[in-house]
């Protein structure tokens, strides 16, 4: 086993994943990546002949992003599911091969999977070497890994957008090109360019997802979300998938069940077409890494959509369900989006026995809401009432050091605005920061993919002030954990955004020389202490 794609490991995981991933599953995910490389070599050419291959490529595009997504941290731990992805990748590759496309074949184009799990794992060990030790140049290898992890993040956003009918062929074209290129030679400049192109494509993937979400559910509006609960049967939904939540809300309507969000589903309360459901009540719990404790205490059924799942405890294993690409061995998977088993389980369970009043948090400050008061914001900046903007967001995690983000937000001066997004917000989402002339000082922009919204807000402000983004009174204080964060970081680099503070630790897959390039060219810096960083930013 050799896995270093997430923030939890300072050195590669070699015996067992810090995330709970077993070595066999890790090797199968490596083998799936290898099989996808072979598929990509043919798909890259087939996509150019879209008039002849439209139907088959529609299936392959959908499959490829799902399969890549399944290899992202905390998504799919089910070896049987990964095995099926491997077989399907080879089947689709051979389907394209039979269509006669001329390609420069690599070893992965000829790969034949074993017919049993044990032998597949052995093949996965070989694939691991080919993927993660393919270059003797550690800097090239580092950039290859940044590209691969970015592809996994891009695939996640593309999958969500695709489900809601938003696609762009150039996203798939890049995925195939990059997967194919990983098997071939390329120097440092080639891979630096590939990383920046990944950022460009991820921006497009996030734009598609933004269009998908707002097109179907409306633009988020400022909405108070209760952190308490209602007496009655209950289902909590975690993950990121708005369509799954919508389907569950439709299927639970009139059944006497309250639906709650968990983790990154919190921003869903701001979407008009979701908040209209009267039984869609409030938010339960905090970020993904606390789910074992929080789910054990939840008196209803649990639905995991996409990531982030961690090993279910026995106390709730019989009442947690997965859907989409997420999976865990022994946990019931809802493949067809008929959530009857979830609903039946919720009706069996006691639910909450009494109402509980608690504080509320505000969501819904995506680009449309913020830009609707842009004139007021600009006036306040010009009048000196808003001195600085901070974007404090990204992934949360269990590793020590993340209290920095809580402390940073708490210490921001009263004439500053904090925008936040993704699950990193749970370090401070319920803090009372007050407001500036009616504008809340803490603005929740949304999920991690809503980095697109934050970028649009920054671009609009830079246009209004007639300066570049880097000249705005804006600082980015980011926390990372998994591959979607890597993809977002490459997008920020592609846009030329500088002086990003990144933590709680720097990625293990970034070599010293690559880090030097990022520091010298983009001013990326590790976080220090909240006090030091605030002093440096505001001096």
UniProtKB/Swiss-Prot annotation:
Main localisation: cytoplasm
Sites of Cysteine persulfide modification: 395
InterPro entries, per database record: HCP/CODH, Hydroxylam_reduct, Prismane-like_a/b-sand, Prismane-like_sf, Prismane_a-bundle
Entries under SUPFAM superfamilies matching the protein: Prismane protein-like (SSF56821)
Reactions it catalyzes: A + NH4(+) + H2O = hydroxylamine + AH2 + H(+)
This protein's record includes keyword Oxidoreductase: yes
Any single biological process term in GO: nitric oxide catabolic process
Gene Ontology cellular component terms for the protein in this record: cytoplasm
CC cofactor note: Binds 1 [4Fe-4S] cluster.
Binding annotation for hybrid [4Fe-2O-2S] cluster: 240, 264, 308, 395, 423, 448, 482, 484
Keywords: 4Fe-4S, Cytoplasm, Iron, Iron-sulfur, Metal-binding, Oxidoreductase
Known cofactor(s): [4Fe-4S] cluster; hybrid [4Fe-2O-2S] cluster
Record's function text: Catalyzes the reduction of hydroxylamine to form NH(3) and H(2)O.
Protein name, as recorded: Hydroxylamine reductase
